[in-house]
């Protein structure tokens, strides 16, 4: 079986089984490639450096394809912003974000839970052909989740992150009771 390539942000936080950055999350071959110098802050930025991000994505997509990857994914849902550009630049098929699933969930009332509600913009949804008015909920900026995954912490309090995620999902559904499906933007 030929491998899937994973474009990884340059991070140091723990990656537990289930995280896209942990090889144990897959029962097929994967190749990881760290985009040196491109971290969580770059990907989740309110105003990302688009030329720098695209250059890193292109360079690393080409390298993964040269290593034999037959398709690519990424370690950050915010990279949805570059889906259409990367489709043109990559020598192999690419799926940048779980947000791509929204368009396939026709007939569902979809909400999105994200690492940063304030930085997930209509442009991210447009880049994956999803409705711009999709309800969005986020984890708090002062959360254990943010300490680990947005601020690149060295430790992970799994229980705290679970509580925070469940609370954020409940708050999203309480605010938008029509939601019957939640897509998680974040791969962590």
Language model regions located:
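Non-catalytic positions within long, well-ordered alpha-helices that form the structural scaffold/packing
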Residues: 62-68, 106, 173-175
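Gly/Ser/Thr-rich loops at beta-strand to alpha-helix junctions
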Residues: 71-83, 98-101, 115-119, 183-188
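N-terminal active-site wall of soluble small-molecule enzyme domains
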Residues: 55-59, 75-85, 89
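Charge-patterned, long linear interaction tracts outside catalytic cores
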Residues: 160-188
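N-terminal glycine-rich anion-binding loop in soluble enzyme alpha/beta folds
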Residues: 1-52, 116-156
């Amino acid at each position: 079986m030929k491998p899937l390539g994973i474009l990884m942000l340059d991070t140091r936080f723990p990656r537990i089984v289930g995280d896209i950055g942990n090889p144990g999350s897959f029962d097929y071959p994967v190749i990881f490639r760290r985009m040196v110098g491109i971290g969580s802050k770059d990907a989740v930025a309110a105003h990302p450096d688009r030329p720098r991000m695209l250059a890193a994505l292109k360079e690393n997509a080409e390298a993964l394809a040269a290593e034999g990857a037959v398709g690519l994914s990424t370690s950050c849902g915010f990279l949805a912003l570059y889906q259409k550009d990367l489709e043109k630049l990559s020598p192999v098929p690419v799926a940048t974000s779980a947000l791509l699933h929204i368009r396939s969930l026709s007939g569902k009332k979809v909400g999105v839970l994200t690492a940063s509600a304030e930085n997930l913009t209509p442009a991210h949804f447009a880049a994956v052909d999803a409705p711009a008015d999709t309800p969005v909920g986020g984890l708090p900026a002062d959360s254990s989740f943010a300490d680990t995954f947005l601020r690149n912490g060295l430790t992970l309090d799994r229980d705290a992150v679970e509580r925070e995620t469940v609370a954020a999902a409940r708050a999203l559904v309480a605010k938008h009771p029509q939601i019957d499906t939640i897509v998680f933007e974040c791969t962590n």
